[in-house]
């Protein structure tokens, strides 16, 4: 049950990260606080994405709380790294997120996935 809650948390956190990335690329820079605050006042896709991303993180924390009640931290923490994989792949596939493929990034993703698989392999008896 803990793995399920962990995977749900990772999926929601990944969607939240993508949503926040979408919002930040479209809202005015925080370096210009008045323009940024004004941009938040406008009800548009960027503002909705920002608040959806923040809400997503909140829901993800609830799921993570459930995860840690039933799964060892050493295993649960490994699940978090899957978010990097999901966000990397989605940023390349979804339009407007400016993700770029590189062999170096692909090697990193493969290392993450191999590490998660090693952690979740059953122990020898």
Swiss-Prot record:
Cell location: Cell inner membrane
A single MF term (Gene Ontology): carbohydrate derivative transmembrane transporter activity
Gene3D superfamilies per record: 1.10.3730.20
Residues annotated as transmembrane: 3-23, 34-54, 77-97, 101-121
Highest taxon of source: Bacteria
One GO BP annotation of this record: lipopolysaccharide biosynthetic process
Ranges of the Cytoplasmic topological domain: 1-2, 55-76, 122-125
Keywords tagged on the record: Cell inner membrane, Cell membrane, Lipid A biosynthesis, Lipid biosynthesis, Lipid metabolism, Lipopolysaccharide biosynthesis, Membrane, Transmembrane, Transmembrane helix, Transport
Functional pathway: Bacterial outer membrane biogenesis; lipopolysaccharide biosynthesis
GO (cellular component) term, any one: plasma membrane
Major place of residence: membrane
Topological domain spans for side Periplasmic: 24-33, 98-100
Membrane topology designation: Multi-pass membrane protein
Assembly behavior: Heterodimer of ArnE and ArnF.
Function statement: Translocates 4-amino-4-deoxy-L-arabinose-phosphoundecaprenol (alpha-L-Ara4N-phosphoundecaprenol) from the cytoplasmic to the periplasmic side of the inner membrane.
Family: Belongs to the ArnF family.
Name of the protein this chain belongs to: Probable 4-amino-4-deoxy-L-arabinose-phosphoundecaprenol flippase subunit ArnF
Gene: arnF
């Amino acid at each position: 049950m803990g793995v399920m809650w962990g995977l749900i948390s990772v999926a929601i956190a990944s969607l939240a990260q993508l949503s926040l990335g979408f919002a930040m690329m479209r809202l005015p820079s925080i370096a210009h606080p008045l323009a940024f605050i004004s941009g938040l006042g406008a009800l548009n896709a960027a503002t909705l994405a920002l608040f959806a991303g923040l809400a997503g993180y909140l829901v993800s924390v609830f799921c993570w709380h459930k995860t840690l009640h039933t799964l060892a931290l050493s295993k649960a923490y490994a699940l978090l790294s899957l978010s990097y994989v999901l966000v990397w792949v989605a940023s390349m596939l979804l339009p407007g997120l400016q993700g770029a493929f590189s062999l170096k990034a692909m090697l990193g993703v493969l290392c993450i996935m191999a590490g998660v698989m090693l952690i979740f392999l059953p122990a020898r008896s």
